[in-house]
Amino acid sequence: STFTGNLADYPEMLRMEKEAVGGSVIHVKKEKGEWKLVLDDTYNRRVDGSTPIELTGPARGTSAVGGATQVFGSLGNCSGGRTLWNTALSCEENTEYGDDYGWPNFTDEHYGWVMEVDPFNAKGPVRKHTALGRFAHENTAMRQTKDGRVVVYMGDDARDQCFYKFISKKTFNPTNREAN
């Protein structure tokens, strides 16, 4: 925290801290051999500590997430991956945030998930997928099984931990991104 002890500074400090975490979707373009940011592009957006994020999967609305169906913010983002339907995944590496930051209404169970954002839909929802588990997510790799289901491999960044594998019940639908 950057809190100095002066309560008058607290709202601005809180805003700045929340804006400094998370990730960004940016449009870059190669011009004359150099990669450049396309300023003011409709696809550019931030996912920070204040962004509303939808919870999906079996923990949504349960006591495991304090009854939440939506949480605010993404923290401790590490690596991620790309889905078969060309959205981006970002992994929240840590699961214990609430008291460490001193942010009101931020509870630990809202962090430690895999987050999905569609870089081609600037107005689309950001989602945290509870079906992929809650732990110190390091990364994801996605593949399709021979019978068409989606497999997500995930590493745990905590010391002496595991490698996880999620297999979907339904098959991958290449013509309907929302069905995946």
Feature map (PLM): residue ranges:
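Conserved small-residue
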Residues: 1-180
